[in-house]
Swiss-Prot record:
InterPro entries on file: Aldolase_TIM, CofG_family, Elp3/MiaA/NifB-like_rSAM, F420, rSAM
Keywords: 4Fe-4S, Iron, Iron-sulfur, Lyase, Metal-binding, S-adenosyl-L-methionine
Keyword check for Lyase: yes
A molecular-function term among this protein's GO annotations: transferase activity, transferring alkyl or aryl (other than methyl) groups
Cofactor binding remark: Binds 1 [4Fe-4S] cluster. The cluster is coordinated with 3 cysteines and an exchangeable S-adenosyl-L-methionine.
CDD domains the record matches: Radical_SAM
Function: Catalyzes the radical-mediated synthesis of 7,8-didemethyl-8-hydroxy-5-deazariboflavin from 5-amino-5-(4-hydroxybenzyl)-6-(D-ribitylimino)-5,6-dihydrouracil.
SMART domains referenced in this protein's UniProt entry, alphabetically: Elp3 (SM00729)
Protein name: 7,8-didemethyl-8-hydroxy-5-deazariboflavin synthase
Binding site for [4Fe-4S] cluster: C18, C22, C25
Lineage, top ranks: Bacteria, Bacillati, Cyanobacteriota, Cyanophyceae, Synechococcales
Species, as recorded: Synechocystis sp. (strain ATCC 27184 / PCC 6803 / Kazusa)
Catalytic reactions on record: 5-amino-5-(4-hydroxybenzyl)-6-(D-ribitylimino)-5,6-dihydrouracil + S-adenosyl-L-methionine = 7,8-didemethyl-8-hydroxy-5-deazariboflavin + 5'-deoxyadenosine + L-methionine + NH4(+) + H(+)
Length: 313
């Protein structure tokens, strides 16, 4: 059987507030309108996960502006949540938007990998869906990918599909990721995420075509280096025959399977048991993984390597 991986995960959201206003977003709240997660509540939630097979704690944060007086407190909360997760025996992965060099270097201490969606490299989208989203500037996000490479951090990135990009722009975005990977070799997976309409978005953008998604997967597999794993979120491909077509085109990972998809809250995951059975009936073996791929275990600091070895042994 062909192995398909997934990450048994749970999401902590330090805050939903975000200074970006992407017109397709179903996650954000207005700055200062959201009550931040406290460390004590986070610890209680994580302690309640004992015995449920959860490995990855995805720390997924809305963005506080880099010049805000609250940026330091925001970052310290994100860092401390990673430390709490570590101390409770979990494996943190953080996605908190573009970070400074010092911020990303500190998060490396308490995370097994970091992530940031490239989304699309087209600056044209800054006049449409990203017109009120300063941190979606493509060069800023590409620079973040390079910075993670310079610092030797295993990294997840990806494309958001169906937000107004052209076929050529998709190809250019994949080429940009490939170029960064050829220089640094730190990108472990690329998510190909089809836009899926939700109740909170302000733009009338329709769902991305499953047939188009398969075409993009085929293109990505041709462009990206072989060591990069292609990932799709299975809850955003609800028709199982479409999911099988994605696997046939080159997808080998289904990402974090979580109780609630915080970015797409209208789309729920099947149970792992259901998904595993369906895949097995079609020749695929669903297997859990860590938020860092085995190739990159040696990139981690000694403390993180030790925590992995305890679990593996």
């Amino acid at each position: 059987m062909l192995s398909i991986t997934y990450s048994p995960a749970y999401t902590l959201v330090p805050t939903y507030e975000c200074f970006n206003r992407c017109s397709y977003c179903n996650f954000r709240q207005e700055p200062r309108k959201d009550q931040w997660l406290t460390e004590s509540v986070a610890k209680q939630r994580l302690e309640s996960l004992a015995g449920r097979g959860i490995r990855e704690i995805l720390i997924l944060a809305g963005e506080v502006h880099p010049q805000s007086s609250r940026r330091k407190a925001w970052f310290e909360l994100i860092y401390n949540l990673g430390k709490i997760a570590l101390d409770l025996g979990f494996y943190p992965h953080t996605n908190a938007g573009p970070l400074s060099r010092s911020e990303i270097a500190r998060l490396k201490e308490v995370n097994f990998s970091l992530g940031l969606m490239l989304e699309q490299v087209s600056p044209r989208l800054l006049t449409t869906v990203h017109r009120q989203a300063p941190s979606k500037e493509p060069q800023l996000r590409l620079e973040q990918l390079r910075l993670a490479g310079e610092l030797g951090i295993p990294f997840t990135t990806g494309l958001l599909l169906g937000i107004g990009e052209t076929d050529q722009e998709v190809e250019e975005s994949l080429m940009a990721i490939a170029n960064v990977q050829q220089e640094y070799g730190h990108i472990q997976e690329v998510i190909l995420q089809p836009h899926s309409p939700g109740q909170k978005q302000t733009d009338n953008i329709s769902a991305y075509s499953p047939q188009k998604l398969v075409q993009v997967i085929t293109l990505a597999r041709a462009i990206l280096p072989a060591e990069i794993t292609l990932q799709i979120p299975p809850n955003l491909v609800p028709n199982f025959s479409d999911l099988l077509a994605c696997l046939a085109a080159g997808v080998r990972d289904l990402g974090g399977i979580v109780p609630i998809d915080e970015v797409n809250p209208d789309y729920h995951h099947q149970s792992v048991n259901q998904l595993s059975q369906l895949l097995e009936e079609n020749g695929y073996l669903l297997q859990p993984r860590f938020p860092v791929y085995p190739t990159y275990f040696s990139w981690l600091n000694c403390d993180l390597q030790q925590r992995l070895s305890v679990f593996i042994n």
